[in-house]
UniProtKB/Swiss-Prot annotation:
Subunit comment: Part of the 50S ribosomal subunit. Forms a cluster with proteins L14 and L19.
Keyword list, A-Z: Ribonucleoprotein, Ribosomal protein, RNA-binding, rRNA-binding
Role of this protein: One of the primary rRNA binding proteins, it binds directly near the 3'-end of the 23S rRNA, where it nucleates assembly of the 50S subunit.
GO BP annotations, alphabetical order: translation
Superkingdom to which the source organism belongs: Bacteria
NCBIfam families reported in the protein's UniProt record: L3_bact
Name by which UniProt lists this protein: Large ribosomal subunit protein uL3
Keyword set includes Amino-acid biosynthesis: no
HAMAP family named among the record's database cross-references: Ribosomal_uL3_B
Disulfide bonds: none
Amino acid sequence: MIHGLLGRKIGMMQYFTAQGMAIPVTVIAAGPCIVTQIRTPERDGYSAVQLGYEEVEPRKLTKPQQGHLKASGGKMLRYLREFSADDPQAHTPGEVVTVELFRPGQKVDISGTSKGRGFAGVVKRHGFRGGPKTHGQSDRHRAPGSIGAGTTPGRVWKGQRMAGRMGGTRVTIQNLEVVEVLPEQNLLLVKGSVPGARNGLLQIRKAVKG
């Protein structure tokens, strides 16, 4: 069995359980994905299954990408990602993998690109409390304050938290619970929120710690 799937975030909604409890869920359009390549220890040094997602016009892919996909079934796919599997050799290029890979109650890890926030200050980016608001203080209300000592160490430490670009990075949330699987619509309902904006690409994998 392959341990993951690609999908897109649709949005969030309420889901009512049989007991009438309302829980927040994220709706994900998961798959169908197509197996495009099998990685083997003999040739590649590791075992994995490469999946392709979302058909696209050939002109939007480079010639090497088109050649790679023609060799594995012919469908032109926008995204290619690798996932581990119990037995990669049991799968063949061209095989379709659907959302039925998952089951309600299962724990999954979901990776996506967080929303970009642009250039942000230390209060927003790192949660600094800022300086005093009164007693003659001016222009320093949201400033970081000191960024180091004096002669020793005579420099600013690596990793010092400062203002800068915030968001737009890969984020993984672990152990999210699958609430419902809808194979007819290729939909996956997951409890809680997942990284990124609506329509963002997601990698849904079997939980490492679950």
